[in-house]
Amino acid sequence: MTEFYDGYETLCVPTSIGDFPVRRGGTGLPVLLLHGYPQTHVIFHKIAPLLDPHVTLIIPDLRGYGDAPKPPSDEAHLAYSKREMARDMAEIMSALGYERFAVAGHDRGGRVAHRLARDYAARVTHLTVMDIAPTLRMFDDTDQAFATAYYHWFFLSQKAPLPETLIGADPAYYLRAKLEAWSGEGEWLDEKAYLAYEAAFSQKDVIHASCEDYRAAATIDLVHDRADDHHKLTMPIQALWGKTGFVAKRYDVIAAWQEVAQSVTGCAVSGGHFVPEEAPQEAAAEMLRFWGCS
């Protein structure tokens, strides 16, 4: 975990499911950065140097991904629910002494951040979500176009070991295909970062845990989301999304988040899905402005 983020601390933070390796650097407002699928904490390696002169960054892997703990799965997929993943993050921040903090999440990390803001509203000062609309909205609006573009939601949520077996036959091919399909044009993927993603994603337990993440999203996460869907989040919300991605084409992103939050701002940035790597300069400027640091 030490190949990226020069000058950052590498911490081993205890939680109720085990120790999480965490990178920490910078000064000022504590900001928790959460990665998505099929990546790791490494996704923030370009944007971190633009942010850390102004804020303190705390960058873990999500449970099941990278070097994070990988608890056993269960039939109800509770172990990989966003509620449990959010609890991990709350425990990490408590262990590090941060009772109030901002959180920014990309892809699956944005969904964990959304649940964190729901379940720990008094602790989250600002929420940034990158290239997603709310999970419940996306499932409820499913049609042929969505199912085609987001087929992985329905593939990965199939009963084990079907997706695990198929991905495990050539995880590097699957990983590269996803990164290329979801991104915009241009050279954005650093080869060193790609090799880190490949090393993590090639592990059988990571493949299984990431499938469990999506199984939870299609089952228990929807139960949790429907239970509190009528309560709007009150902290400031920022939505950032790639101009050329499916989310930009499919949704009025600000309006989608206004359905679940009282105060929403945001904008599109260059590129496709992988906002922190495809548009680090634009995204960093918007995030710092949102946090009142610019």
Predicted feature descriptions by range:
Residues 37-48:
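The serine-hydrolase catalytic nucleophile loop
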Residues 2-11, 17-22, 30, 43, ...:
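Flexible "cap/lid" subdomain of the alpha/beta-hydrolase fold that forms the substrate-access gate
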Residues 38, 53, 121-122, 262, ...:
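Proline-centered flexible-loop/turn and helix-kink motifs
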Residues 29-35:
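Short beta-strand element of the alpha/beta-hydrolase
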Residues 272-284:
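Catalytic histidine-centered segment of alpha/beta-hydrolase-like enzymes
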Residues 46-55, 95:
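A short, Lys/Arg-enriched amphipathic alpha-helix followed by its capping loop at the start of a domain
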